[in-house]
Amino acid sequence: MRKIITLVSREQAVIGHRFRVVSIPDECKSCKLYAVCLGKLTPGRSYEVIEIRPSLGQRCKITGEEVVPVVAAELPIVGLVPLNKALEGAIVTFEGECKGCKDCPDNIVKPGEKIKIIRVLGRTRCKDRDFATVEFYILEAPLPSELGAVGTYQDHSRAPLLRRPLK
């Protein structure tokens, strides 16, 4: 579960409040608070307020209302994956096999993105195929600073693997 510090209205600054980012208005992108407000959130994803921080009296450029810093947790996405990929804890590549089916998350997840399946909720049939309804998180892509010269991910958390003959 990814945690993000962001800004919400005073009315939304309640622990347990859930909200979904539908889109980001163009007016927000020129606001000085954008980077700490909607700039950290992803359209199509849902969040839950888990901690409230002290307010510094900032106001929203659009509503004029006070905004409050909160810690929000990204909630899992509910969608379809083929049955052969539906294993709790598995990290799989979303291929969009369910495109056109009800509950297909193809408007949120792009084909080729890695997802981690949290829980299998049930089964469904669409287009003569069996799918599992699952809760999952989209795994974040590595930061540009973590990419090497050829665009491959370099994990700096462990030493390089060396192959040595056994003695």
Curated annotation (Swiss-Prot):
It comes from the Archaea. Transmembrane segments: none annotated. Pfam families: UPF0179. InterPro entries: UPF0179. Belongs to the UPF0179 family. This is UPF0179 protein Pisl_0688.
